[in-house]
Amino acid sequence: MIIELADGADERLADYTRLTDVALRRRLETQRGLYMAESSKVITRAVAAGHAPRSFLMAPRHLDEMRPVIASAAGCGGSDDGGEVPVFVAPEEVLESITGFHLHRGALAAMNRPELAGVPELLASVRAGAGARRVAILEDLVDHTNVGAAFRSAAALGIDAVLVTPRCADPLYRRSVRVSMGTVF
């Protein structure tokens, strides 16, 4: 459903205003938490990977270009107005008051974190000949920008899967996702 906003203090925007990236990761842990997808390209890639949006937030000028992406998103029921998924539309100055920065990419989406396959599942698929043949491992890489760049490079090199060690920076952190241009999905 498209919801036009004139005020950034709307309670329905809590995913965008009240949570740090760390809190997004931990929030609703039973539902796998949240992450932010920023820019139409990244949102398009997240939706294409089957990630389900909680909501969209964008400037009016981006609504028409995002309608096909919204319609194809899980939970939107094929409706380009989002169906049951809120599509918040607000003027640029309201978006800036919500996010704290000029949203020059024009669109954000609060996405549910997907449940990822573990190492045993990945290895079993490799043994069965159906899984990843080229695997990269990011070990204890702590800078989010570097993690995003590593995923982008892995995609360019044709890497099939990337394993991330527990002490590695979160690949779904907003900056990692943005630097990767959505290749983390």
PLM ranges: what are they?
Residues 1-71, 168-169:
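Boundary-proximal intrinsically disordered activation/regulatory segments immediately upstream
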